[in-house]
């Protein structure tokens, strides 16, 4: 049985999807982009600012589901420019400090709202 996870501490869905779904002890998030949940506005700073906001949104969503960064088993990071890989890693490492999750990082041509990155995760409760 699946449970829909939703929180105002992460951006509302901008399409027909859930912020996250829990099935048993597993949590599957949708991609989080750097939208400031309180205002609905985009974080328009550099890649580091956008990464902080997007990953912060992801962690807020996981917390709502009874999870945390420590319980993430896999992330996928979509970035518009692979030249930003090192900067994203620098921010990513502030959220995932030990026993980092498995991760894929994919360069894409375009992302929703023309942001620089999007991050999704699979975690346990």
Describe the predicted segments one by one:
Residues 2-125:
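Short, polar/acidic, helix-capping and beta-turn segments at strand->helix junctions
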């Amino acid at each position: 049985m699946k449970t829909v996870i939703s929180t105002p501490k992460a951006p509302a869905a901008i399409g027909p999807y859930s912020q996250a779904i829990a099935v048993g002890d597993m949590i599957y998030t949708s991609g989080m982009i750097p939208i400031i949940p309180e205002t609905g506005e985009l974080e328009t700073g550099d890649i580091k600012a956008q990464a902080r906001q997007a990953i912060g949104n992801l962690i807020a969503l996981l917390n709502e589901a009874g999870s945390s960064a420590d319980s993430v088993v896999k992330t996928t990071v979509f970035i518009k420019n692979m030249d930003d890989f090192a900067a994203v890693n620098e921010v990513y490492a502030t959220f995932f400090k030990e026993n980092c999750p498995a991760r894929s990082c994919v360069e894409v041509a375009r992302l929703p709202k023309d942001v620089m990155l999007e991050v999704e995760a699979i975690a346990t409760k």
